[in-house]
Amino acid sequence: MSDENLLTTLDTYLASGIHIGTQQKTEDMRRFIYRVRADGLYVLDVRKTDERLRLAAKFLSNYEPEDIMAVTRRVYSVGPLKKFGQVTGINTVAGRFVPGTLTNPSAKKFAEPEVLFLSDPRVDKQALKEAIEIGIPVVGMCDTEHLTAHIDFIIPTNNKGRKSVSLMYYLIAREYMKNRGLIGEEVPFSYDDFLEKAMNVKVKMNTAPRQRGRFQRRPRR
């Protein structure tokens, strides 16, 4: 596979791990899978990811930034998503999605977007549920194990890694801005700007020792 016609170099795609899936797959995602490794890990087709990413950015560019809502609850996506919103002007919800945001006019942060952009259809299930309820199209980053029945536009990708999600948000932001004529070949932001936001995230680990003897097995009768 050459770099010709790709949105970035093949080396950049591979280094980001954008093609690394999981050890589960669904029939919905089968068409985007390139192969399965000896360890059972499914590998996504980079060229198909590039193609869908390009088309997704083109689709989103039909909408004004204020008419798009981009959502994520994934820890490593929060920083890159905020950067995505900063450079594009697109509305973002990074972190908990408050129930009723799209369906309850009395909600404090009620919004009426025309399209929803998700980082993960399973993790962002509340936002997806409400988008379905109000009937707006949904663009979603989907890994090999996802069900996609309610995703109108699938972007097959590793949506869990710091590097991969940073690259996705960077490329979509860049192409969205280009398609709308807001930037030219000189891009005022970089992949590293997005990656920096992801790398600064520190995940708290639960180091408390487990309490033994709290739960006891009942004798069989």
From Swiss-Prot:
GO terms for cellular component: small ribosomal subunit. InterPro entries: Ribosomal_uS2, Ribosomal_uS2_arc, Ribosomal_uS2_CS, Ribosomal_uS2_euk/arc, Ribosomal_uS2_flav_dom_sf. SUPFAM superfamilies: Ribosomal protein S2. The keyword Ribosomal protein applies. The keyword Chaperone does not apply. Keywords: Ribonucleoprotein, Ribosomal protein. GO terms for molecular function: structural constituent of ribosome. It comes from the Archaea. GO terms for biological process: translation. NCBIfam families: uS2_euk_arch (TIGR01012). PANTHER family: 40S RIBOSOMAL PROTEIN SA. Belongs to the universal ribosomal protein uS2 family. This is Small ribosomal subunit protein uS2.
